[in-house]
């Protein structure tokens, strides 16, 4: 294996390629270096390598040495010559030097050696590349040359004036690299320590550049000013002979800069070069002495001179003529500022006397930069702007024009927008830069203030001071500071130039604004060094223009050039764009500050006033700019972004809590508490539980609860808000556990229910007041309230431990009696509660607690369930908050689903999308929550109403709970029967509307009136209490199916019909449908009333009658209202009608299991749970009758249902069919009512087997119950939301018949449903 070490691989290749040696050597190589050798010879060991290898190696070594030497020579020459001729012939010289170095180097010519001497041309190319590599890292050579030449020439002149020639070389400008390497103190021209470039630029190059710049500036200024002062030979472009054009061609850097991308965007050719604070390259030192040149960090250059270092040349502080235009080009203000002492710093500069230079140095240590020095030089030669010499005018005009031309050329060169990172980088520097700017501005005011009267002298002295201070201070003002100063300077300097041009400082305030506008606009372009990248407005463009108007009168500052609009707009946007953008941002900030300050200091437009303005602007920039930049806008008061669609986060309790977070605001709790108190006061009157006993406890408890709520709620809310969903779930679990714990029960008992009600209602009032405003917090508030109430109840429960035991026993008994109902009800409540969270946060707060409660209720023992009921009741009063009434059905569905789908709540369309339905759902859920809260409060007040007797309370509590459940059942069973079928109808037809209406009415009326009843059942706000009780159990069992089905159904409804759920449920509310619904409502109401009143309680029948009477005419909305008003009763009746619900649930479960049709099963389940199992089946039909069948939502529901059966949707062809369908529905409702009555008569939660309902509907194809039962076993025809879905258990086919045709099949289907119901009841029995 041959190891050939040589930089020139070709020499190695040539070894083998030589004709004569090729074969022999190849053979030798093959022989000597076969892989078979036991060892590979080390070619570098002399003894082990053959002679040809030795020769080759020697050749390679020698060639390498030669190459190294040549490279060294080339690099040294390149440095020297490139820096000498850096502006123009640096690269060409480098190339020549490389060639010369190559040629001067002895060329190896070894006989038979494969090494070939370096090709001088190639070497030249390599040296060029190397040169490029060396120069790329620093400020672009153009910029360096410009800075060096401008500054060097200026400084040379200045040293002649004896002001900044501390360096041995008068024109020495020390450009430091970020590396911090400083050129030797004595350097001619800019010394950039980038890599190897540490050579002095020839003064001739600087002179050339300066002459070019002066001519450009003068010509530009003349054009701007309309002065003919040096109109002769104006460079057509900024291209400086050796620097821009030649360098551009030869320098890879190009005229802009090959620095950091930011630097590239922020820098321009000398006059326009703006070195942003973010530039990595160098810090421009005013001083010739390197001592004052502090290593320029990215912001150092800018700090060195705000505007001039920004411009990268002495733009800010440039002499009146050169500096103004240069400043203008570099930083919008510089041009003007140079003409009229750039801002406070540059102001002195225009009078480029030794004194003024000194003053400027003092005043403009930051503003001054190398380019500013160049400007000084030019202005020095030209005279001070303040002196208003004709030459000054010409110079100022030339400067302005030159700056404009430069800015144009630079802008042309810099067409790109600065990268966003610079903005961040710059933004990071904002504070420091602003501080430095403050310091610099403060310094400037000191220096500039004196200049007010002695501006010319001060300008000279300022220039000197500027250089000196640039040397000494070199105050590293970040480009922001520089720009703020720069902008200030621009503002003032345009005035100053006007003053200079006008010769009137006073008038320059007025004319200067206009002129400043011209200059500002122009120099805004000139500012394009950075602005050129951000559409020339850059920072300088935007801020200078604004700044200069600011100094005349901020009025113009705001109206930036439309061209600059992007830059002005970019002040914020540009920030990210680059330092240019940053400058624009800063300039905007400074502009604003300047506007604020300059407005007051407009009279200061004169150079001295400008100084004052600058001083003012500096504090303003610091204060306002820093405030503007660093004052992070307060986080939005909104607790959280609008919650994602309910399906996303409603499903997740944690997410719900997180999104809806318990309102950390105590005020919300207080408002809710006050509201709860108000509602409780109403409820107290309405509640069956004696509240006389609870008065004292209520007061005490209200105080305690309020205190706890106030003290704990904020924390709890904050915790809920801050804590992740898991923590909230944990809190909920703790809450539930606490509620479950006998202590909690005892506490709840102990807590006067009235008191709790009042407290909770007060909280609800407060919360409701707050919640509507902040929905998400309200949920958290509910949770926190629940947790607080639970804690309070716990505390009180601890006091009544013995009572807890008794009460636990009683509660256990009561729960055993009501456990199914409570559980079912709780589940709906939970679902109802949790769904709202998924909607807008307003209604969310209540749901999460209920979810917890419902989850707990599902898993908690009866006593715990009862407590949970109470908690849920408390939560429902919270729901009672005045959120927009959520649609009942969605609440119901969501409740159902929420228990089952707590993890993944049904995807109800977000309330925003379906405001009516979702709001209704939310409101309904909130209503349910309110009801549950009120009921809980009632229960608590009932339990605690007799604080004297905790055991009595326990006894009373169970009794009351039982009574409440019975009363609620009695009151609501009628409403339940009716409301169940209404719920089905409402769910089907107007689930959303019904939910909305019901929830709206229910929270206000029924929550108060039937709070106690609802507390027992904790009915879902939607009219699905009974329905959902059974459905809840069923859904718990079929939770996944129901969840999926319901979510699918909801999704289908929402998707298929973007209309509110009510619309989706009731796509078409036809008269026939309404009639069917009414008939069903009447039949079901009567039947259910009969059934409910017979088995359970007569009050239920009465309520059912009232409900059915209400339901009969009920339109979807009215039904919602009725359901709303009766939903507590419904839930109570659901609790009391648990047996029927159980039967219904069993039927539904069996039907769902048999049908496994996702949406149809869910619909049936919902309907049946609402309407005693059979009623719900028809109710989907009648309410939705044709509509659901016809509605795309229903169709989508069927299509998307999980059932594998085919769904054949048949639309009723004729009103006759629809009428027959209505009749069949009525008959079916009657049958279902009979079944429900039978179940209720059994009065056991466990549904007693009811003989299969006899199908007596006038529906053709009706089968006897047995047949239907059998058919149900084989086929379960499920009417879902206005559609009859024949679910083939075998998965063969499901026929969905719209109202018309469905009427015919309704008999069979309803009979089948009834038979299925009977079968389920028998199964349950």
Curated annotation (Swiss-Prot):
<feature type="compositionally biased region" description="Low complexity">
    <location>
        <begin position="528"/>
        <end position="541"/>
    </location>
</feature>
<feature type="region of interest" description="Disordered">
    <location>
        <begin position="111"/>
        <end position="131"/>
    </location>
</feature>
<feature type="compositionally biased region" description="Low complexity">
    <location>
        <begin position="369"/>
        <end position="378"/>
    </location>
</feature>
<feature type="compositionally biased region" description="Basic and acidic residues">
    <location>
        <begin position="515"/>
        <end position="524"/>
    </location>
</feature>
<feature type="region of interest" description="Disordered">
    <location>
        <begin position="935"/>
        <end position="981"/>
    </location>
</feature>
<feature type="compositionally biased region" description="Low complexity">
    <location>
        <begin position="296"/>
        <end position="334"/>
    </location>
</feature>
<feature type="compositionally biased region" description="Polar residues">
    <location>
        <begin position="400"/>
        <end position="412"/>
    </location>
</feature>
<dbReference type="GO" id="GO:0030154">
    <property type="term" value="P:cell differentiation"/>
</dbReference>
<feature type="region of interest" description="Disordered">
    <location>
        <begin position="291"/>
        <end position="348"/>
    </location>
</feature>
<comment type="function">
    <text>Able to directly activate the TNF-NFkappaB signaling pathway.</text>
</comment>
<feature type="region of interest" description="Disordered">
    <location>
        <begin position="68"/>
        <end position="92"/>
    </location>
</feature>
<feature type="region of interest" description="Disordered">
    <location>
        <begin position="829"/>
        <end position="891"/>
    </location>
</feature>
<dbReference type="Pfam" id="PF15273">
    <property type="entry name" value="NHS"/>
</dbReference>
<feature type="region of interest" description="Disordered">
    <location>
        <begin position="1084"/>
        <end position="1138"/>
    </location>
</feature>
<feature type="compositionally biased region" description="Polar residues">
    <location>
        <begin position="450"/>
        <end position="460"/>
    </location>
</feature>
<feature type="region of interest" description="Disordered">
    <location>
        <begin position="1293"/>
        <end position="1313"/>
    </location>
</feature>
<feature type="compositionally biased region" description="Basic and acidic residues">
    <location>
        <begin position="428"/>
        <end position="447"/>
    </location>
</feature>
<protein>
    <recommendedName>
        <fullName>NHS-like protein 3</fullName>
    </recommendedName>
</protein>
<feature type="compositionally biased region" description="Polar residues">
    <location>
        <begin position="935"/>
        <end position="948"/>
    </location>
</feature>
<feature type="region of interest" description="Disordered">
    <location>
        <begin position="1243"/>
        <end position="1272"/>
    </location>
</feature>
<feature type="compositionally biased region" description="Polar residues">
    <location>
        <begin position="1088"/>
        <end position="1100"/>
    </location>
</feature>
<dbReference type="InterPro" id="IPR024845">
    <property type="entry name" value="NHS-like"/>
</dbReference>
<feature type="compositionally biased region" description="Polar residues">
    <location>
        <begin position="335"/>
        <end position="344"/>
    </location>
</feature>
<keyword id="KW-0175">Coiled coil</keyword>
<feature type="coiled-coil region">
    <location>
        <begin position="53"/>
        <end position="85"/>
    </location>
</feature>
<feature type="region of interest" description="Disordered">
    <location>
        <begin position="595"/>
        <end position="614"/>
    </location>
</feature>
<feature type="compositionally biased region" description="Pro residues">
    <location>
        <begin position="834"/>
        <end position="850"/>
    </location>
</feature>
<feature type="compositionally biased region" description="Polar residues">
    <location>
        <begin position="1302"/>
        <end position="1311"/>
    </location>
</feature>
<feature type="region of interest" description="Disordered">
    <location>
        <begin position="368"/>
        <end position="570"/>
    </location>
</feature>
<feature type="compositionally biased region" description="Low complexity">
    <location>
        <begin position="1124"/>
        <end position="1138"/>
    </location>
</feature>
